[in-house]
Amino acid sequence: FVLNYLNTTTIAFISLISLLFFLFRFSKVSHTKEPPIISGSWPLLGHLPLMRNTQTPHKTLGALVDKYGPIFTIKLGATNALVLSNWELAKECFTKNDIVVSSRPKPVAVELMSYNQAFIGWAPYGAYWRQLRKIVTLEILSNRRIELLSHIRVSEVQTSIKELVNVWSNQISSQYGLLDDTKSSSTNDEPSTTDYVSVELKKWFAQLTLNMVLRMVVGKRCFGDVDVENKEEAKRFLENIRDFMRLIGTFTVGDGVPFLKWLDLGGHEKEMKKCAKKFDVMLNEWLEEHREKKGLGSEDKVVGERDFMDAMLLVLKDKPIEGFDVDTIIKATTLELILGGSDTTAGTLTWAMCLLLKHPHVLEKLKEELNTYIGKERCVNESDINKLVYLHAIIKETLRLYPPAPFSSPREFTEDCTIGGYHIKKGTRLMPNLWKIHRDPSVWPDPLEFKPERFLSTHKDVDVRGQNFELLPFGSGRRMCAGMSLGLHMVHYILANFLHSFEILNPSPESIDVTEVLEFVTTKATPLEVLVKPCLSFKCYESM
C-alpha cells in the first residue's frame, strides 16, 4: 500500500460523497460465520485511512492480531480483504485451497503498468498463466539455464569488487603515495578509518544486481567502468525502476471506489501511464536489436551465450498466447524479470548488511567461516556456497525479519470457501501478513531478535522454498515466486564475495537506521553508508 496521496482534502471530498450514498447502502444478513471485521471502517473508503498510519501497513495490521485474532477482514474501499497472521491458516490457504486463491486482482496500477496483466506474476489464473509459467520455468529460469549463465554473475561481482578496490587504491594513493604490498590491507595492524573508503551500499547493491540481471536478460550493463553503453540512459532507467516500484504498490482511489476512477485523484494514473511508456520505448528498442541479431545468425549462438530475450524469441517463435501477441509477452516478461530480479535482491542484501553491522559478532563469525573455507588467496566461487552453512542461516534469518513483500503478492478468491472455520466470499482479496507470521513467538523464540543460529539448531530443517509455512518470504503454492532460485543464487554469491573481499566498519557511532518504507517491496528508507577496506591479497584482486 502506498497511500500518502490520501491527504485531508481527498478524504474530505470522498467522505462528502459517501454521505450522499450512505442511506442507500443495504447489508444482507448472513447466516454463515464470517471472520471478524476490524472497527473504524469509513463509508466508501473502508479502512484505507487506517493505512495512513505512521507505521507500515504490515505493522499496523500486525498490531491488531491481539484484539481480533489471527484472521480478520478489512475493507479496501468496496473490496473485502482477508488478513491471515499465523502459519496454520497460511497452510490451509496454500494447500487445500490453493487453486481457489491462485488468481490475481486487477488494480489500476497492474492494468496500466503490466501490459494489462501480461506479467506472469500478475496474470489471472488460467490458460495464459499456465502456458507462460511453463515456458519461464523450463526455458528461462530453469536450474540448467541459471547454471549456464553463471559466468555473468561471476563477471559482474568480480568487476564491481575490483572497481571498488580501485576507488580505495586511488584514495589511499592520494593520501599516502603509491601503494606497495607492505601497505596491503592483509596486515594485522589495528584498523584506522583513514585506511577505509566510504561506499553507499544500498546504491552499490542496486547497481550491481541491475547490471547482473540486465546482462542475463538482455545482454547489457548500465553501471561501472566496463562496457557501459549510455550512462545517462542507465541513470534514467534506474530512476524509472524506482518510480515503477513505488507506483505498482499504489492503491488508488479508483481501486477502492471504482466510480471515482475517472477523477484520477492524486494524478497517479497519469504518472503510471508515463512510467509504463518510458519502459515500453526502451523494451521496444531492445527487442528490435535482438531481432536484428537473430537475423544475422545469433540463433546459432552457444546456448550459454544467449540471454533471456534471445531464449524467449526462440521458444515463442512468433506464436501468440491466449490473446497476447509475442512482442507484448516478451516485453512484459523481460521487464518483470528485470524488476523482480534486481530490486528485491538488492533490498535483501541491504537488510542483511544492516543486520550484520548491528550485530558485529555475527559478522565476525561469518568472516571466520569464509576464511576457513575460502582463505585469503582466492575469490568465492559459486561452488563454495553450499558449504557456507552460516551464510545460509544469515540469509534465512534476514528473509524472516524482512520478507521482500510482507503481504506476498495479492491473491483473490475465485469462489466461496472456508478458511479457519470462516466462510470467505468469492472476490475477497487474500493478504497473508508474512511479516507477522515470521514473528510468531509460538514458532520463533525471541522473534524480534536476529539469531541466525536458530537455523543451525531448532529450525535447521526450515527452508524458504514454500514448504515450511512458518517461513514464506517467496510465498507458497502455485503462485509462489518463479524467480526464487535465481534470486537466492544472487544473494548468497554477492554477499559472500563482498564480505570476503572487504573489511567493513560503521562510520558512525550511532546504530544503523532500519526504518522501513513499503513500496511494492519493503526497502530501507535511508542510505546505508559504510567504510570498506580490501582484506585479501592484492594478487587476488588483480586476477579478477
Swiss-Prot record:
Transmembrane portions of the chain: none
Superkingdom as given in the UniProt entry: Eukaryota
GO annotations of cellular component type: membrane
InterPro entries reported in the protein's UniProt record: Cyt_P450 (IPR001128), Cyt_P450_CS (IPR017972), Cyt_P450_E_grp-I (IPR002401), Cyt_P450_sf (IPR036396), Plant_Cytochrome_P450_Monoox (IPR050651)
Coiled-coil region list: none
Main location: membrane
Pfam families to which the protein is assigned, alphabetical: p450
Family (UniProt): Belongs to the cytochrome P450 family.
Designated name of the protein: Cytochrome P450 82A1
Organism: Pisum sativum (Garden pea)
Top-level taxonomy: Eukaryota, Viridiplantae, Streptophyta, Embryophyta, Tracheophyta
Gene: CYP82A1
